[in-house]
Amino acid sequence: MKKTLEIKNLSYSFGDNHILKDINIYVKENEVVAIVGSSGVGKSTLFNLIAGVLKKQSGEITIDGSDDYIGKVAYMLQKDLLFEHKTIINNVILPLIIAKIDKKVELEEGRKILKQFNLEKYADKYPKQLSGGMRQRVALIRTYMFKRNIFLLDEAFSALDAITKKELHKWYLNLKKEFNLTTLLITHDIEEAIFLSDRIYILANKPGEIIKEIKIEINPNEDIDVQRLFYKKEILNIMNIE
């Protein structure tokens, strides 16, 4: 399976503050990879570099083998950033509006994608009429509509309650299978990382560096909860968290 995203020897400093040191990671096509780490170790800085929000200082970033990576990712934050004065369908088609697609085509595509995601009944509602979990679903659909090579999810589920979060995790994994999504996510929630991911990178220290890569391999014929607990204990031990 080809590598959609690859980062080699990436370091970043802000003045005398060294934030990231010699980062080497990759994400394969249709893979979900998580980066976990304590606050302040540079997770969001890394995402901002991949997204082109921050200018790369050293190292390599390639998407599908090309170093022309700017504009090749779809970036979703913890806050859904929906426009409260726009209907759900008009929020969803925002990427098409930016791309200056014909208005009729925009709306047709919007209704089509909402139907695909089983959310067509919300098309003419406004964000304030939706629950937190439903708003986040809409935000994910809008992110998908950018049609980029890879999703960057920055604590995208962290503001949700535990039950809604679990529902959204399952929903996202179904989307990943159906639409062949490739995802790199930041999360402070280790259980979330284990549930969603094929692999996990642990970012630690100052400046932040990758100290461990863990491949998540769950055997469906054995106790799944016990296996996940084993991975959680391993990660907490590596991070020196009791």
Question: What residue spans do the PLM features occupy?
Answer:
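Helix-to-loop junction immediately C-terminal to a conserved catalytic motif
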Residues: 51
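Conserved ABC transporter NBD signature motif
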Residues: 59-71, 109
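The feature captures the beta-strand-to-loop junction immediately N-terminal to the Walker
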Residues: 36-38
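Short helical segment in ABC ATPase nucleotide-binding domains corresponding to the A-loop/adjacent helical element
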Residues: 89-97, 107, 215
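Conserved ABC ATPase signature
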Residues: 126-130, 134
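A short, proline-enriched helix->beta-strand linker immediately N-terminal to the Walker B motif
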Residues: 145-149
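Conserved ABC ATPase "signature" region
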Residues: 97, 104-122
